[in-house]
Amino acid sequence: GQHIDSLEWMSDETKAKAHEKLNNFYVKIGYPDKWRDYTGLTVNPKDSYYANIRRAAEFETLYSLKDEGKPVDKTKWYMSPQTVNAYYNPSSNEICFPAGILQPPFFNFDADDAVNYGAIGVVIGHEMTHGFDDQGRQFDKDGNLNDWWTSADAEQFTKRAEILASQYDNIVVLDTVHANGHFTLGENIADHGGLRIAYTCLLYTSPSPRDS
């Protein structure tokens, strides 16, 4: 929240909305309270890889179609617990960290604080920042596509986002091939935000982090 408050270019009105959204994050950690039923999915080692993948894709599609016309289930996970990844879902304003990523090298109970903040801390901050990047900022605290920014603040955000995109545009990948800063803008914003959040948390944890 203090990073929001430190934005000199953002109005108090938009800051208040940003705080509302941040405070309304739905956090999922480890594994869901209820598990998916996979009894309808047949995985046959005697079949071809294609046949198994096709059945899995059909099973997943039918599973998704069952939600049509029903109220949104906020307890539903869109990633399995064993997946080494994390996500932010703007349409439900949720952040999810499966059990798979809560282990080395991302999190180690015996590691130094700096190691964990530099690993899982950055990941957590990255996903949180997605709620306020060029895509996530278009959704409100309830996950609705709703413009909660003042026009002046939106203009200031776009101006700064363009600077970041241009910075990445100048990265040479190979010979004359450059990175596309606009294509990766959301991830770049989230990376920068994740680093700032993790480092700020480390400062509060360690009495003298600069000396360690």
Where are these regions (language model features)?
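Intrinsically disordered, low-complexity linker/terminal regions across diverse proteins
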Residues: 1-206, 212
